[in-house]
A protein has these predicted regions:
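Conserved, structured core segments of small domains
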Residues: 1-128
Length: 128
């Protein structure tokens, strides 16, 4: 497989969007009471990131069966680079207090379609 930046250049050269975002998968460390206690601060932090355009999307994911909530989540950041995205993830109260651990990866968005902008926490819609 090619190096990441080489692949990104190849994608751009073939006309793909090649927009680099950062995907964080987050899992509880075991203390569910700490997760519940930290949730309000975590949600406030997410709203701040959304207002500052660093948060693209975030929310919980189910278990593999699709039937159970397992307190895992996915966060997509817009950041200058992996180090900047890691700063955002480290500052999340869930990670800062040790309620959750995370993995972060670069994501190259090449395809998809959006027709409008929605700020989920404030329920604002922009039909630009």
């Amino acid at each position: 497989m090619p190096a990441w930046n080489d692949y990104k250049d190849e994608a751009k050269n073939r006309g793909a969007l090649a927009m680099e975002l950062f995907v964080v998968t987050t899992k509880p460390c075991g203390d569910m009471e700490l997760v519940k206690k930290t949730l309000p601060d975590h949600l406030k932090y997410q709203e701040q990131l959304e207002a500052g355009d660093a948060l693209v999307m975030a929310g919980p994911v189910s278990d593999a069966s699709g039937e159970q909530m397992n307190a895992e989540g996915m966060i997509i950041y817009r950041a200058k680079n992996l180090a900047a995205a890691r700063v955002l993830a480290d500052a999340d109260p869930m990670h800062a207090v040790g309620a959750r651990r995370y993995e972060i990866r670069k994501w190259l968005v090449n395809e998809g379609k959006f027709k409008f902008s929605i700020a989920l926490s404030t329920k604002e819609v922009d039909l630009a």
